[in-house]
């Protein structure tokens, strides 16, 4: 009779563990690919691209820096460092609020808008080749619906509806 203890199974074994690990691995792999492609072709990180895109979506191509940080899921110090780099490149400018000196805005410049336009084709091609092209339309709709159930920051957030 063996006195050795049974070796526990290591790694994801339940459906929830398998799904969680698959999501983490897919996310990490996609971020590396998208970052690499944008850096190689346009000298932008994926976070740079997301900030330029978010600013371009605003009617005046401008947002309060604190709101921009929240919209791209960065900390206030993280958005400050990122914006400093984009400011040095001439893609973003800092603007003050005339009614509240504590408030500063990030403003997308024409040069930043052009850089975003150029990088968009690379990003869209990456999404199609590394992600969307691997699923049917129905699968993409299901995946989008499932992922939108997840909160973005905390229990009060509404996932994709926030």
Where are these regions (language model features)?
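N-terminal helix-turn-helix DNA-binding core of bacterial DNA-binding proteins
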Residues: 32-75, 159-162
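Alpha-helical linker/hinge and terminal dimerization helices associated
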Residues: 30, 34, 72, 115, ...
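Short, hydrophobic-biased segments on the C-terminal half of alpha helices
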Residues: 65, 83-84
